């Protein structure tokens, strides 16, 4: 018996239980019967390796001509990987006026806008094709975008979605959209954070990822959102290579109950704004009863351990009042107030952490007072049974590797000063892990 002998019902079950979407696509390409049967399954997940008008225009025509395929699309990744559209595809933008005109007419607000939009589509511009396509996918739940500037068509479409304007005047905007990932198209500058607020307003949104987000306070799409509070169901924000001097206040206060926040501050080629940990603590305080995971550190992918900011080693702020917080990952320099005090810092580490703590990770461990920090960790482990009953893991990261000793050996001075801490962790049943972070790579050391 071959695959061609299997009944349609069994083939559909195989496709439904297949975790690798590429395998489903390969199966659909075996013969015309399989393609006709599995076409809707194939369209549930679309991944453009390289985003270009050739691909966008063909997909847009397809979902307009076949509404059942538009209904099938759940995941759409729009060229977030680095690369370029093949040269053979660049001049081949598909534009069939009779097919596109109803969709453009439904989205445009004036005849002049409609005419300009049609011209932009014919010219093969990515932004107008993206803005036209997205509202055509009513069941889209996961979206990955590579954003450019100024992206005026997409910004306009998002603004209309927030305000319930045409084409969203008869149906709710993006009712199934749960996850959005936005990546900047270049290696400099970044995505203005005000451009991202409209995504937070969609009813099903729960998770937002952003790469190279730069905080701004200008009037982006739907500027009225800048002053609104708790209108978003987003629970998870993950920002890498980001720059935010003021603590992303309007993004964080938009959320009703944030559960996870990850912020990795970028090097200076993206922005020269200061790295100010204290302002993030203030912005996160409204979520002290819901926040479960916090990661806040510097991006050292380029081997830079510092931003050059005068505020980068400031105390993040006390976390004891964050009653749901279970995982904390901070720079060692930010977890204590090192600015004053007889011991070189103010307050004890154990006093700054929440009772629900399960995992504590300290980054750039080598850039603080090693003896003082180890003593604080020893005190933390010593009282863990009573104050932190769920604490199971402590992770230490930094420049800890001794290249001269070979293998993955730790520097002798680090081994000496942490020997007692290791013993205390072992006796308390706490897994103490040591990681060397170097040039964007992380590996275990002992």
Language-model features: locations:
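Leucine-rich solenoid repeat modules
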Residues: 14, 298-302, 308-446
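Leucine-rich repeat
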Residues: 88-285, 289, 301, 306-309
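Soluble or luminal CAZymes and related metallo-dependent hydrolases
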Residues: 6, 26, 51-58, 121-129, ...
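A structural motif corresponding to the C-terminal end of an alpha-helix
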Residues: 129-140, 286-290, 321-324, 387-388, ...
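Hydrophobic regular-secondary-structure patch
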Residues: 2-91, 142-165, 182, 303
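Short amphipathic alpha-helices and their capping/turn segments at secondary-structure boundaries
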Residues: 59-75, 132, 195-196, 247-251, ...
């Amino acid at each position: 018996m071959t695959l061609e002998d299997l009944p349609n019902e069994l083939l559909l079950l195989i496709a439904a239980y297949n975790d690798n979407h590429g395998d489903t696509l390969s199966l659909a390409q075996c013969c015309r019967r399989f393609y006709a049967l599995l076409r809707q399954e194939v369209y549930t997940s679309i991944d453009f390796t390289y985003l270009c008008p050739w691909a966008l225009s063909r997909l847009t025509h397809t979902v307009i001509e076949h509404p059942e395929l538009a209904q099938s699309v759940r995941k759409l990744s729009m060229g977030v990987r680095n690369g370029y559209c093949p040269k053979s595809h660049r001049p081949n933008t598909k534009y069939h006026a009779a097919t596109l005109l109803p969709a453009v007419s439904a989205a445009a607000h004036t005849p002049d806008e409609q005419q300009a939009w049609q011209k932009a589509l014919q010219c093969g511009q990515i932004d107008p094709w993206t803005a036209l396509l997205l509202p055509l996918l009513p069941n889209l739940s996961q979206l990955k975008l590579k954003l450019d500037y100024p992206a005026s068509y997409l910004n306009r479409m998002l603004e209309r979605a927030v305000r319930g304007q045409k084409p969203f005047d008869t149906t709710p905007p993006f009712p199934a959209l749960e996850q959005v990932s936005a990546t900047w198209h270049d290696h400099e500058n970044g995505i203005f954070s005000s451009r991202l607020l409209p995504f937070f307003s969609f009813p099903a949104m729960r998770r937002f990822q952003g790469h190279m987000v730069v905080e701004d306070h200008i009037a982006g799409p739907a500027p009225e959102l800048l002053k609104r509070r708790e209108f978003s169901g987003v629970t998870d924000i993950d920002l890498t290579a980001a720059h935010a001097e003021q603590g992303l206040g309007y993004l964080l206060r938009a959320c009703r109950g944030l559960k996870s926040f990850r912020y990795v501050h970028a090097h200076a080629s993206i922005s020269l704004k200061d790295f100010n940990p204290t302002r993030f603590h203030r912005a996160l305080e409204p979520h002290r009863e819901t926040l479960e995971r916090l990661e806040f550190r510097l991006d050292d992918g380029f081997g830079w351990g510092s931003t050059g900011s005068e505020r980068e080693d400031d105390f993040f702020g006390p976390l004891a009042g964050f009653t749901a917080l279970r995982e904390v990952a901070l720079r060692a320099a930010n977890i204590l107030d090192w600015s004053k005090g007889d011991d070189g810092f103010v307050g004890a580490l154990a006093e700054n952490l929440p009772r629900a703590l399960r995992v504590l990770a300290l980054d750039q461990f080598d850039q603080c007072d090693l003896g003082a920090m180890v003593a604080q960790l020893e005190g933390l482990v010593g009282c863990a049974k009573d104050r932190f009953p769920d604490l199971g893991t402590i992770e230490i990261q930094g420049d800890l590797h001794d290249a001269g000793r070979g293998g993955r050996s730790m520097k002798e001075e680090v081994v000496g000063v942490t020997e007692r801490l290791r013993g205390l962790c072992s006796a308390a049943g706490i897994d103490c892990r040591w990681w060397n972070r170097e040039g964007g790579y992380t590996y275990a050391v002992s």
